[in-house]
């Protein structure tokens, strides 16, 4: 059990946790160009006897050393969400065996723990150090790229995503993220090229459909955008997708369909102010002006900027 726990630790923080809020997302308002950076989620192996990182030498694990004793302590601290102590134990582990080939992974783990604590610059430095040690490690590049997005260093993120597709041309997450960054920059041609490349490598890709949905919405093709959103929603519904499809329905005067999506989204996340803003827009289109004003206030109460709320409904 202890060995399994240590090995789990070695892989755990290489993954960008779903609880790091999309931090790794580029976001704009629902009535503007909506974009988001996909997070890569991979299964954590439950048991293994050897450990290797992409671009690193495979090594056997001896769990009897002080190096792994520190890791076990670090994992206990992580389980308790005691990030500062976990950080200390990882540093002690690295210091105990400076030449251990697993250190690039520990440094990446350290970066992710720092990210949890909001130490973004320190996290970037440590991701960079880990990547210098294993330059072709796609997961590390992806982690640093998503952190660059969180730190509003979009050009650096783009550079990392491009490195990923140079190593692995069929990596759909990286291509999706590149496409979404181009979309944020209003470079629609390059965005479309990335989404088409995803389709070429992965004909049934949901990410390709999602990217094309946002692209069509950004370029005013709301009917086609709604169709793409529908394909993704069938397989993997989310509030973001429902809200964006609802907005497309509003733009094409399909008010009943928009109402269904808005109500479904509000049932899932009733604290999302933008959903009330969408509903206010719907009610205004139905000439329910008093109800629309109530929803505008609800949107503001749930964190929407008052100026944005009023501007969106002009």
Residue ranges and their predicted role:
Residues 66, 100-103, 137, 171, ...:
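Residue-level recognition of tetratricopeptide repeat
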Residues 103-106, 140, 174, 208, ...:
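TPR alpha-solenoid repeat register
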Residues 96-99, 133, 167, 201, ...:
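Structural marker of alpha-solenoid helical repeat scaffolds
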Residues 29-30, 46, 51-61, 277-314:
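Terminal, low-structured helical/coil segments at or just beyond the last alpha-helical repeat
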Residues 79-80, 116, 150-151, 184-185, ...:
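Register position in tetratricopeptide repeats
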């Amino acid at each position: 059990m202890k060995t399994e726990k240590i090995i789990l630790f070695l892989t755990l923080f290489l993954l960008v946790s779903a609880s790091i809020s999309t931090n790794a997302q580029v976001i704009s308002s629902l009535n503007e160009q909506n974009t988001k950076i996909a997070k890569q989620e991979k299964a954590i192996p439950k048991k293994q006897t050897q450990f290797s990182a992409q671009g690193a030498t495979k090594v056997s694990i001896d769990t009897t050393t002080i190096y792994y004793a520190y890791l076990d302590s670090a994992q206990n601290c992580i389980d308790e969400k005691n990030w500062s102590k976990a950080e200390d134990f990882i540093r002690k582990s690295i210091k105990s065996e400076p030449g251990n080939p697993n250190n690039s992974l520990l440094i990446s783990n350290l970066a992710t723990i720092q990210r949890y604590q909001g130490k973004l610059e320190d996290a970037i430095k440590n991701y960079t150090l880990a990547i210098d040690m294993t330059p072709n490690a796609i997961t590390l590049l992806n982690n640093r790229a998503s952190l660059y997005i969180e730190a509003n260093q979009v050009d650096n993120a783009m550079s990392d995503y491009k490195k990923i597709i140079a190593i692995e041309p069929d990596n759909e997450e990286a291509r999706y993220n590149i496409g979404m960054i181009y979309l944020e920059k209003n470079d629609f041609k390059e965005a479309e090229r990335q989404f088409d490349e995803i389709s070429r490598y992965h004909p049934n890709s949901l990410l390709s459909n999602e990217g094309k949905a946002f692209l069509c919405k950004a370029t005013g093709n709301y009917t086609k955008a709604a169709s793409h959103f529908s394909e993704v929603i069938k397989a993997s519904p989310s509030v973001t997708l429902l809200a964006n499809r609802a907005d497309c329905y509003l733009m094409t005067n399909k008010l009943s369909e928009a109402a269904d999506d808005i109500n479904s989204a509000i049932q899932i996340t009733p604290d999302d102010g933008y959903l009330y803003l969408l509903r206010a827009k719907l009610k205004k289109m139905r000439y329910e002006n008093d109800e629309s004003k109530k929803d505008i206030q609800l949107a503001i109460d749930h964190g929407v900027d008052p100026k944005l709320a009023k501007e969106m409904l002009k």
